Amino acid sequence: YNYPLWTSNITITILYCKIKRGYTTLIFLCFSVKDRIPLINDFFHFLSNFGLDVWYDRRNIYLGDNRREKNITYGAENPNVNYAVVFYSENFKNGNICLEEYKILLERYYKNEIFLFPVFISEVPPKLDKKFQICKTLVYKHINDQSDFNALALHIIAKITFDDLNNSKFKSIHDIVLDYSDKTSIYYKLIIEYQNIKKTNYNMRIASLFFLYLIASQTRSISFFYDKTMNYIYHQNCLDILVDEKRELQIMENIICYTFSVL
């Protein structure tokens, strides 16, 4: 594919990229079955835009399966689950399996085995039972319908990509600049161009990071999650669909830092 650069008449040919389908991050959705349709079901499908690996009972459990074994052993207790979204509602507090899952997730949270994302459906209750207090102690979000999915997903992905930087040589774009010895490299020049873009020119900054990612990843093994996320954010930007919190840029910079750490 040929992509014209925005700074000159140069055209860069993208050869190929190696995409790793597997990804170590697994997210568990904890919710009341009464909230499944349509809200949770639709949110699960929305997350597929980003290539996240999500444990969701409607996808992972089949007719005839042992429900408890699947939900608990392969779900909440699964050592591969390192993030969990807890959807609290009036239905949730009176639930059955979801409360058993929640208890396990909470125990794992206090052991630093997982990270919790508390989400309130509809309204945030003024008072909560003691066992649910952590949902208000932690930074939380609340959602009403599909219009809230994008902001929630971006918060989740921002945290995951930030955590990935623990295994990255670079923690910021500026770190890459300081480390780069070859000042004639196309990578170095594109990063400098990115830094020179006016901070308020948000659309151009996203486009710049996307093309930098395309070039940097063309001969390197990258995660399906990263590739889907970068593409989704870029194409949403092309449609001028952005949220006010501007999490997109933070996510893209995190992915660039991780990608360059394995160059």
Mark where each language-model region is:
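Conserved N-terminal substructure of TIR/SEFIR domains
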Residues: 1-83, 113-114, 188-263
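Short, highly charged low-complexity linear segments
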Residues: 146-152, 179-187
